[in-house]
């Protein structure tokens, strides 16, 4: 799809191309009120009160999510007008805007309309700007049109009529809106990559497949890539990472990608993504019901690849490193057993009390490896704990950090990107739950505060830099009829990096 921006003076709707421009359809928002404003007022005046008459007749009341097509309206250049109910104006926040946008896209996607003039981004969204509305609309459309059918014998490649979307904004918003459109397309492309990787079955998306995907990404976007095999990881004394792959015939891959958009010596942001391409639980075997969804246990890795793709497409002026420890966690005669003790790259010994708490075992060595980049910040992303789902459900990702400034940046980014996260505690008192009689620490801390103790475990390997942990177990994919990867938290991570790139620290 092609996205473009058309700037105009909205106070002169009928004389500057806003209403007279040719297209298949123009999308107009109508608030739940007898008083028209914005684009709706302009179109009402241009049509001698048509909208006023429609509202009085009860055909469109402006209630949230309602839509109405008008055909061949005199005085309007578009062949059709799509009216979209926006609800109450004083409650028109980012959620209400998202609902309205999705209602509009659904109505349009059911037609043969090819080109649309879209005005909803210029509506008065509470605490948001028109450029934010442009980007959000692009992401909503791309989410609605995403389909994963490539594993079917006859993939569904039904061509959609809708090809071109022109966002109509005020002249003063043009520059920001053009940047937002570019960002929206890049984010959508990154999210699609993340979704595709998550939705692939684990017999296709193996650690080697992730490594090959990283290599292709590096070739396409001029990134630097290095893939360490098991012998190289042994030489680096990554005993914790390698303990997880011990039961699998699939070779582990330790993937490192580098994007150089900032100054050569500028400290990078490092993203570490959990890449367990299938998690049976190992010897601590999971129940069979729902185990198919454990192909999504590599969504942290997928989000790192998707974010790097988006960053490269946007050309952000900062340095980013992606680290992906990729393994399968399988039971076999050679698998790590409960009670085994392994030695991490940092030198700390770990008693593996539960082999299904494997994500932290691969992440801890990746976090130690990250030290060599002298990072400005490190963020790990992992489908780490079911406890996080119990705590937060499927709306917020769990955020853990002892660095208030870094946590604040990530929370601000989550709100701006509509990719919410919630900060959870990381108090030192929880560390006591990880004590072991036989090793420096255990890999689990019991049932209480399971997501917190998992983060506490990771924190033991992050003394050298500012660090945050995102537990995306509840947000990386959906179950049930809408089963599939969500592409989260690519928007959050990308927004964090956009904000960092706008800060002088990123290029120094």
Swiss-Prot record:
Question: Which residue positions are annotated as catalytic?
Answer: 286, 360
- Cellular component terms per the entry's GO annotation: cytoplasm
Which GO-annotated molecular functions does the record name?
manganese ion binding; metalloaminopeptidase activity
TM helices/strands, residue ranges: none
**Location of the protein in the cell:** Cytoplasm
**In the record, which residues are listed under signal peptide?**
none
Binding note for cofactor: Binds 2 manganese ions per subunit.
Q: Which cofactors does this protein require? A: Mn(2+)
Q: What class of enzyme is it?
A: hydrolase
Which GO BP terms sit in this record?
Answer: proteolysis
The record's similarity note reads: Belongs to the peptidase M17 family.
Protein name (database record): Probable cytosol aminopeptidase
Q: Which organism is it from?
A: Paraburkholderia phytofirmans (strain DSM 17436 / LMG 22146 / PsJN)
